[in-house]
């Protein structure tokens, strides 16, 4: 009688499902390359994330975060001549295994991991290098919902053509375009230079800014413009300052010519309420001690 190389393949599906639930990510990835049946069974397990993060750095890597594990990393060892790739799976403890499938490229591995761990194929890209078109060729069949641009050489406006499903965008070094600002993103995080006009024309729901010194007068103009109807989709506007890099916000300057009510006053934060003529209200909060942030949240 011939020996079965992988006895687990002979188990009935209901027994196999129970066994799979007792296993971890490493075991699942090892088993998923043995047969299509096991691959599909693992993909239906509950608890895996709906989205995973794919980082393009000097070496290609992929990070998965979900309920069944806090953090799981992958690296690709690429054969430059054939473009075949081995997958190294890392755990939080720093241990890893290497998986090899003949003919598998980086694209094949990404699609495989996405199917097994994230069935809807929604991904987050972190771009450290300017080769965005090369990245697109690898992930074009997936639904890219979030992109973080670390490279200063990527034109942010190019992203909208490549990734029409984009909802979350982080721009850390690249210049930001008016096309991006006026696009209906759910969340825009900016660490590059922005102006008052950039803020006023933005059409995102959640706008987060770091590393910019937005003055009290500019914030006053922004709030007065919001009261008059600007930024209609805005739900949250957030500025994070480095500690003690500027003078404290002045209440008299911030709310000049604005009707407002102070709702809370603490050592580390103060909260005020402003409103539009139609009754829409917003909470304005900042840190009076360290001056580390300014936050405006529209009430719904």
From Swiss-Prot:
Q: Which InterPro entries match?
A: F-box-assoc_dom_typ2, F-box_dom, Zygotic_Embryogenesis-Asso
Q: Which organism is it from?
A: Caenorhabditis elegans
Q: Which Pfam families match?
A: F-box, FBA_2
**Protein's recorded name:** F-box associated domain-containing protein sdz-33
Tissue expression: Expressed in D-type motor neuron cell bodies.
The coding gene here is: sdz-33
- Residue ranges of the F-box domain? 5-51
| Knockout or disruption consequences | Reduces the frequency of axon regeneration. Results in shorter regenerating axons while non-regenerating axons have larger bulb-like structures in comparison to the wild-type.
Origin: domain of life: Eukaryota
What does the UniProt function comment say about this protein?
Answer: Substrate recognition component of E3 ubiquitin-protein ligase complex which mediates the ubiquitination and subsequent proteasomal degradation of target proteins such as mdl-1. Positively regulates axon regeneration by targeting mdl-1 for ubiquitin-mediated degradation; probably thereby reducing levels of mdl-1-mxl-1 heterodimers, allowing free mxl-1 to form complexes with tdpt-1 and thus inhibiting tdpt-1-dependent sumoylation of ets-4.
């Amino acid at each position: 009688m011939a020996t079965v190389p992988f006895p687990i393949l002979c188990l009935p599906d209901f027994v196999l499902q129970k066994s799979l639930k007792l296993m971890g990510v490493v075991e699942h990835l090892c088993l998923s390359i043995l047969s299509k049946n096991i691959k599909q069974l693992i993909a239906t397990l509950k608890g895996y994330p709906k989205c995973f993060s794919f980082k393009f750095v000097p070496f290609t890597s992929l990070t998965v975060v979900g309920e069944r594990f806090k953090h799981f990393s992958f690296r690709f060892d690429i054969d430059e001549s054939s473009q075949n790739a081995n997958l190294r799976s890392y755990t939080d403890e720093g241990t890893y295994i290497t998986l090899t499938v003949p003919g598998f490229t980086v694209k094949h591995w990404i699609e495989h991991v996405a199917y097994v761990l994230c069935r809807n194929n929604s991904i987050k890209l972190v771009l450290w290098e300017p080769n965005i078109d090369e990245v697109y060729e690898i992930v074009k069949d997936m639904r890219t919902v979030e992109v973080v641009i670390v490279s200063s050489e990527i034109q942010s406006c190019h992203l909208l053509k490549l990734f029409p499903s984009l909802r979350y965008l982080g721009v850390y070094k690249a210049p930001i375009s008016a096309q991006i600002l006026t696009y209906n993103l759910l969340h825009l995080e900016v660490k590059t230079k922005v102006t008052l006009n950039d803020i006023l024309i933005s059409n995102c729901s959640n706008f987060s800014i770091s590393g910019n010194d937005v003055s009290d007068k500019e914030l006053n103009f922004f709030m007065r413009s919001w009261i008059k109807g600007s930024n209609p989709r805005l739900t949250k506007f957030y500025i994070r300052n480095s500690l003690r890099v500027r003078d404290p916000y002045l209440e008299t300057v911030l709310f000049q010519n604005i009707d407002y009510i102070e709702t809370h006053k603490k050592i580390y934060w103060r909260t005020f309420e402003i409103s539009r003529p139609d009754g829409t209200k917003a909470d304005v909060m900042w840190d009076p001690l360290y001056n580390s942030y300014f936050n405006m949240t529209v009430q719904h």
